[in-house]
Amino acid sequence: MTISLFVTGTDTGCGKTFVCCEILNHLGSQGLDVVGLKPIASGADLKNGCLQNDDVKLLHKNSNIDIKEHDVCRYIFPEPCSPHIASSINNTAIETDEICKFVNDFKNKSDLVIVEGIGGWHVPINSEEMVCDLAVKLDIPVILVISNKLGCLNHASLTLEAILKSGVQLFGWVLNRITNDIVAAGAVESSLEKIMGSAPVLTIDFDHQSADPMQFEVLKKLVWSNSFD
């Protein structure tokens, strides 16, 4: 059976792509067929006649099924701005039903499908829908990435509230230590655990830029426990 996960974050730049790639790389090395998808990407450069985005490139690099780089993204725009604005500039309508079909097509090609959102939970993707609406339509468990920067407690609390209100299942959260220059780091992380109601399923360390392998083993067991079917 294929397991699918939707990765969102507290904001842009919190480390969603890095977390996706860490999970793909580790579980792919365990013999699983894995693919990372970025249905919507904004901020792309034109190279050799094709739009290329750094996040899309990394997700493709860490996927191990036979696909082309452009296959992992359904909508890509050159402008580095909110997708509803980028799509309007390019006269392209982003349709969530089309994205759902795009994602579902990969379920027959891999054991694990990781879908990376764009920006945060309430980023508009068209005139009527936000990232959260796409996640609801996909109806797959959500992983929330939280970076340990100033303001993360407020960001985490608001995003958690919105995720739970949407009715999707929160599979777990990831602490991404993007900096080691934070006042009272231990107290901040303890506060995050209190807000989230659990310890993170993964902690990405600033110095090592990788998670503890033992955490990946726990994550693998959680993913394949089928507890969220």
Please describe what each predicted stretch is.
Residues I99, V103-N126:
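Switch II (G3) loop of P-loop NTPases
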Residues N126-K149:
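Inter-motif core of Ras-like GTPase G domains
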Residues C14-G15:
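Conserved glycine(s) of the Walker
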Residues S4, F18-A93, D97, F102-N104:
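N-terminal phosphate/diphosphate-binding loop that engages ATP/GTP or pyrophosphate donors
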Residues E161-D229:
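C-terminal lobe/tail of nucleotide-utilizing enzymes
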Residues S127-D133, S157-L160, A185-S190:
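Charged helix-capping and loop-helix junction motifs
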Residues V7-T8:
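Hydrophobic anchor at the beta1->P-loop junction of P-loop NTPases
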